[in-house]
Each structure stands twice: as structure tokens, then as C-alpha cells.
């Protein structure tokens, strides 16, 4: 990542259905006075391959372009309400996989949120997701196991909202060598 006095260029692939609200929430967290950040918002092109891109999506984001991604310092892939689908049934899965390869090859810092984390864990490490018997919904304590610059200012733990129908296999996550 860049030095503190430089602007940090972060790309965000916004996969959520409530794009405006998701954008507002990420901007509130990532654009602080003590950290100069420029956010570039993207949408998956393949998601709109058979239909027109909605006006609100066009106004707030641009088509995912790996050449533009290569110029960024970091990249975030948001969640999406797709956890009930098999990964291969997602219309833009190959586009995501190309993005994952690009980010890794270019050495770009990555953050995956919710379903974005599930699909990345599956792609990079073969970790499976499984459906829960009922939706997990609520605010739960999180523990920080390792310090990282992105987590500066947080205590040893924090509360985070959860709303999902699937989880990753904990035993497979524990087997990941990294």
C-alpha cells in the first residue's frame, strides 16, 4: 500500500442489490480525514449481458475493466444475496475469477466481504460453502486475530451485523496453509 501522505486508490466491485446504500456505507467507513482515499466503483459487465445496465448503476459505477483495476492500490468485492446459488450458477462467475487472477498477479491488496469472501475462499482455496437451516441474522462479536493497517483504531474486537443463508466450512478454513 502507499504511504500515508499519498492518496490510496481503491476499487470496489459493488454486487449488492441496494447499490446506493452499500456505496454510502463503504464511503462512510473508508473516507476518513486521517486517510486520503479515492474510491472507484465497478459493476460486473456479464451481469448485464442480456439487458440494459440500470441508470442508477451507470451513474454510480463503471464496467469492470481489468486494465483500470491494475492501476489500483487495493480492491474490495462486496457481498451479494447469492449464497443460495452454486457459484457456477452466478452469471458473472468467470468475470470474478478473471478479477481474482488479476488482483493476485498484480499484487493488489484485496478485501472480500460476505458472499464476496465466500466465492474468493472457494476460488483460491477450494473452501466450500454450505446452506444453513435458517437465515443467520443479528449483530455478533468479532475477534481480531492479527493486526493489520486496515484495522487500525479498532480494539481487539468489534460488533458486526450478519445476515446470510450460508457459511464456509470451518474445518476447511482451518486447513488453509496461509
Show where each model-derived region lies.
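Short, solvent-exposed loop/turn segments at secondary-structure junctions
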Residues: 17, 47, 80-83, 117-119, ...
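A structural signal for short, well-ordered beta-strand segments and their strand-loop junctions
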Residues: 40-41, 110-114, 162
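Pocket-forming structural segment of enzyme catalytic cores
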Residues: 123-178
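Short, flexible, glycine/charge-rich loop motifs used to bind or transfer phosphoryl groups or to couple energy/partner
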Residues: 1, 63-67, 101, 149-151, ...
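Cysteine-nucleophile active-site neighborhood
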Residues: 77-145
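N-terminal beta1-alpha1 cap of cysteine-dependent amidohydrolase-like domains
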Residues: 1-88
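Beta-sheet entry/capping signal
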Residues: 9, 74, 108-110, 158-160
Amino acid at each position: 500500500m502507499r504511504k500515508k501522505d499519498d492518496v490510496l486508490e481503491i476499487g470496489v466491485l459493488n454486487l449488492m442489490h441496494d447499490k446506493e446504500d452499500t456505496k454510502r456505507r463503504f464511503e462512510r467507513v473508508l473516507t476518513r480525514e486521517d486517510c486520503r482515499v479515492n474510491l472507484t466503483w465497478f459493476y460486473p459487465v456479464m451481469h448485464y449481458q442480456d439487458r440494459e445496465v440500470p441508470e442508477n448503476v451507470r451513474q454510480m459505477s463503471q464496467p469492470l475493466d481489468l486494465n483500470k483495476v491494475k492501476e489500483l492500490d487495493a480492491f474490495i468485492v462486496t457481498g451479494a444475496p447469492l449464497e443460495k446459488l452454486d457459484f457456477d450458477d452466478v452469471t458473472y462467475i468467470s468475470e470474478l475469477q478473471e478479477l481474482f487472477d488479476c488482483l493476485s498477479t498484480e499484487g493488489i491488496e484485496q478485501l472480500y466481504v460476505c458472499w464476496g469472501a465466500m466465492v474468493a475462499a472457494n476460488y483460491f482455496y477450494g473452501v466450500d460453502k454450505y446452506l444453513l437451516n435458517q437465515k443467520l441474522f443479528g449483530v455478533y462479536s468479532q475477534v481480531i486475530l492479527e493486526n493489520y493497517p486496515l484495522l487500525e483504531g479498532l480494539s481487539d474486537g468489534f460488533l458486526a451485523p450478519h445476515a446470510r443463508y450460508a457459511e464456509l466450512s470451518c474445518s476447511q478454513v482451518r486447513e488453509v496453509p496461509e
